[in-house]
Amino acid sequence: MIDSLDLVIDTIVAREVLDSRGNPTVEAEVLLEGGAMGRAIVPSGASTGAHEAHELRDGGDRYMGKGVGQAVNHIEERIATALCGLSALDQAAVDAAMLELDGSDNKSNLGANAILAVSMATARAAANGLGIPLYRYLGGPMANLLPVPLMNVINGGAHAANSLDFQEFMLVPHGAPSFREALRMGTEVFHTLKKLLSDKGMSTAVGDEGGFAPDLGNVEAGEILVEAISKAGYKPGEQISLALDVASTEFFENGRYAFDGGSYTSAEMVGQLEQLVEKFPIVSIEDGLAEDDWDGWKLLTERLGGKVQLVGDDLFVTNTKRLQQGIDSATANSILIKVNQIGSLTETLQAIDLAGRSGYTSVISHRSGETEDTTIADLSVATRAGQIKTGSLSRSERVAKYNQLLRIEDELGSQAVYAGAVGQGPRGKA
């Protein structure tokens, strides 16, 4: 029998650790009265939306200005004082207390990185205190849907030092019968792609998210991916499709999109994306237009919304207010979920809930600056999101999430359902 007093927050500690790019980030540990402990590390993005919650950095010379000592101090000196004595089971109350303590619209006083670290660590402490997995604690008895992975195997844009304008070219193994098989399929294509690139004399060095970063044009990248899928023994569009993260805000300036040597209006950009969808088995396009180009997004949705998943990342920044604006204007049909864009677990769950009630899909996502923390793997199963973006099939901070999903699938046994096998997630074109 678990005593409720055992689940009361007793101590909170924090430290500065490193992410996958060698930059400092925040780790928090929440210890409960009964001895259970939860630990979490927050990620950090390279291409960040202008409307994201504020990530607190120290400035100055230390770590080239990227230290997080202030955020760590806020946790140990202010957040700990406010939260000790609260029940870890009341996630909403814990997060609300931190938001009230911060008092800003974008978490700029305490830092979203400080608040999120404690928020995630609290949930893990509660799960550990109850002796149940995190996905079960967050999702209850219906948490059994394994997500379709969107595997970023060719990196460009802000994630790689190459000529590729679009940020991510992803494999989507929706035709697999299980997550384990989806992972195998993606891995086999990844290694086939590596050999293809090597045979063509191209670089097989990897970018921030573990994908290859060759000097290619956007069309060439699509062509070599389709070739790799076929050479690995799979059917493009039927078993494995493609997804893009255009990250178009990165090359949007003065009302025009500059990429592949051209300069395009919003309408012309939509036309470029339409051509790619006609040419390749693309089932999902993320940030096809810039974060504040609402008119362009509306046109994109009218033209392609019935054919492919249109994901708002910089557009929505995991924020219910911006998502509601999209819903009200019939803009996009999917939201990318990044816990550090909004900065607390409760607000993340609220965004996923609003999306689901409004007919929008949710894609749980990592950041380019990641760590060994696997919270998002559990979150994807807990929320039955049906899709996850967590990078390529290399670099241990990416693979850690895939391995956690394998463990969850094994633990669920016959109760496990792969989203692709039941028609959830982005659909292929046979």
From Swiss-Prot:
Gene designation: eno
Function: Catalyzes the reversible conversion of 2-phosphoglycerate (2-PG) into phosphoenolpyruvate (PEP). It is essential for the degradation of carbohydrates via glycolysis.
Record GO biological process: glycolytic process
Taxonomic source organism: Synechococcus sp. (strain CC9605)
Family (UniProt): Belongs to the enolase family.
Subcellular location: Cytoplasm; Secreted; Cell surface
Main localization of the protein described in the UniProt heading: cytoplasm
Protein name: Enolase
Pfam family, one: Enolase_N
Metabolic or biological pathway, per its Swiss-Prot or TrEMBL entry: Carbohydrate degradation; glycolysis; pyruvate from D-glyceraldehyde 3-phosphate: step 4/5
Binding site residues for Mg(2+): D245, E286, D313
Keywords from the named record: Cytoplasm, Glycolysis, Lyase, Magnesium, Metal-binding, Secreted
Cofactor: Mg(2+)
InterPro entries xrefs: Enolase (IPR000941), Enolase-like_C_sf (IPR036849), Enolase-like_N (IPR029017), Enolase_C (IPR020810), Enolase_CS (IPR020809), Enolase_N (IPR020811)
